[in-house]
């Protein structure tokens, strides 16, 4: 029998928790009742859900970096620097690669190796290895809300530790933290794991603790058309709502054409709210997060700042509640704290200048919103149809059939038949739609837009367009044109 989209009964959930908390020694320090009391004492300005909702009411776009190092004191120093020097509105703990794959013994070895070397030898903060107490030390050392950001298909123990440790938001989902990150984890297993993470948040919510959940919007971060990304975000939001989550931040990764990106953020918010209403989820707070460019970055620092500023502009004009900040060292790997703060400051400058402004209405914007909503509806309708009305069943079958198909994903459970490319204006269209359940009108529109570009490029509509587009932005252009001979 497959897992279903049903709220996990409390008794069954508590039995599951006993097993999960035994998977690493730090799990024994999680005490739900004590954690509820601790979380209730966190002031509103350090609660992720409360602060996000306030920003949303005021129409403000906030800024959050990515950051994480393995040693506790260094991690605290890093976050304090991004808070004080960078001016971040929210703080992260980006979790290391070992923890993401539940390889806690190697995480422990990485901490010890980093201590001996006197420098970071891991790409994030191993929260499970440190445990509840040290996570609370991080929270108590800063003045801003904390969120765990990672990429973990099975984040059950991690979720227990970070929430008990005072983190009031957790990023991820059963699709977005599996298909773009893992090769051999089934959709059913990762959805089940994230239903647990969501049920934990729902339990806290039932006991008076308001926590935020954030599906990972960019997916593979490489030419992902808006409707596929939005469908995944809506599915993960609905799965979370079923488990009792009330504060959900749906996300989207910058594609590059500002009109399409603004249309996508507007559509994302409206579609998510519509589905919440349709299925009877009440008292929901839906906010949005816009991710600055997730693809290849220019190596030149000044050009990198230009790309960061474009993303900041789009985030502000789209009305996104939050923007995830990149750094000018993105092309080289893990940034210095100074470079990270520089990205935040550049972002905040743009956000402050554009405060209160919105992208003007136009016929082109309205058409793009209409198209995104129509494409997303095709996907969602088919998911519910093949699942017999059950969202989990439908999602599993949708991946099996290629009804949901994420471009450039490593997962063996992803069909990999969809290929995107930019049109002549830089909007991302479906070059090869695979088995996506679109109408003929939608398919014809996508093809027509790509034929317009092919005519301008003096070439055929083919896979080389996609290849050229993947490398274009890092070379300083949006659309990958053929090399002049």
UniProtKB/Swiss-Prot annotation:
Keywords: Cobalamin, Cobalt, Isomerase. Adenosylcob(III)alamin binds at residues 68, 123, 180, 297, 326, 330, 334. The keyword Ligase does not apply. Pathway: Amino-acid degradation; L-glutamate degradation via mesaconate pathway; acetate and pyruvate from L-glutamate: step 1/4. InterPro entries: Cbl-dep_enz_cat (IPR016176), Glu_mut_E (IPR006396), Glu_mut_E_C_dom_sf (IPR014714). It comes from the Bacteria. Catalyzes the carbon skeleton rearrangement of L-glutamate to L-threo-3-methylaspartate ((2S,3S)-3-methylaspartate). Heterotetramer composed of 2 epsilon subunits (GlmE) and 2 sigma subunits (GlmS). GlmE exists as a homodimer and GlmS as a monomer. This is Glutamate mutase epsilon subunit. It comes from Treponema denticola (strain ATCC 35405 / DSM 14222 / CIP 103919 / JCM 8153 / KCTC 15104). The gene is glmE.
